[in-house]
Curated annotation (Swiss-Prot):
One record GO biological process: cerebellar granule cell precursor proliferation
Name of the protein in its database record: Proteasome assembly chaperone 1
Sites bearing N6-acetyllysine, chain numbering: 264
Stated role: Chaperone protein which promotes assembly of the 20S proteasome as part of a heterodimer with PSMG2. The PSMG1-PSMG2 heterodimer binds to the PSMA5 and PSMA7 proteasome subunits, promotes assembly of the proteasome alpha subunits into the heteroheptameric alpha ring and prevents alpha ring dimerization.
Residues passing through the membrane, by range: none
Oligomeric form and interacting partners: Forms a heterodimer with PSMG2. The PSMG1-PSMG2 heterodimer interacts directly with the PSMA5 and PSMA7 proteasome alpha subunits.
Species for this entry: Callithrix jacchus (White-tufted-ear marmoset)
Modified residues (Phosphothreonine): 18, 54
Entry annotated with the keyword Ribonucleoprotein: no
Molecular function GO labels: molecular adaptor activity; proteasome binding
Family (UniProt): Belongs to the PSMG1 family.
Biased composition (Basic and acidic residues): 26-37
Residues with PTM N-acetylalanine: 2
Gene Ontology CC terms, in alphabetical order: cytosol; endoplasmic reticulum; Golgi apparatus; nucleoplasm; protein folding chaperone complex
Amino acid sequence: MAATFFGEVVKAPCRAGTEDEEEEDEGRRETPEDREVRQQLARKREVRLLRRQTKTSLEVSLLEKYPCSKFIIAIGNNAVAFLSSFVMNSGVWEEVGCAKLWNEWCRTTDTIHLSSTEAFCVFYHLKSNPSVFLCQCSCYVAEDQQYQWLEKVFGSCPRKNMQITILTCRHVTDYKTSESTGSLPSPFLKALKTQNFKDPACCPLLEQPNIVHDLPAAVLSYCQVWKIPAILYLCYTDVMKLDLITVEAFKPLLSTRSLKGLVKNIPQSTEILKKLMTTNEIQSNIYT
């Protein structure tokens, strides 16, 4: 095989190597038992949306069933804690579904009776304005499950007249900069938005060559493809567990159009957040 550009290293074909590979391929041929195991695992890893009240699956995607104008998605413990304290306590929210999934990092099997310490992915809408949706997702959605999650939530042909806001965290060591990460004022916010998102961001935009990962990246890419206005707020922090300072780093979002009308009493919400942190510390303490 010829090189396609100067300096490219190419391997010459080797008959012996080809024969070895053919023997390995024969040894790797799938048996009926292997196929059955693979199919069982695939079924186990299917993402399902359920109504916990009725214990039934949603037959259509969430946003096909319910009209949506605004959708706020919190991914990870600190983002979830921010929405719980500042948004969910400022209005009456009704649960409309929850995601049931199983993978290497998320093994919650009983979605009907979730404890406060379990990983979860729950969807709500605002009773006074049912087109406003909120998702609290503290569980890990594996790479092979992300497309399923998007289909179950948005559907195969999503509406474009809605606005998506995503909140999540990454460790500060993932942030690429010419400076030392030790000198950065952690935690700090960066934003990344789709081409159709026209509102100003409440923090600086994420610079190249930084990238986003996992479910937040999948949601943002989906919105870019479908021309849905969406913005991701990414908090870089040196504390990935539930942390008061990291949660409060999301406070600039309270002035954005997405959240401005949803938060009524910031001092009261701050007190609720502190109580939430205290409860979490007590539950995490092995000596209590």
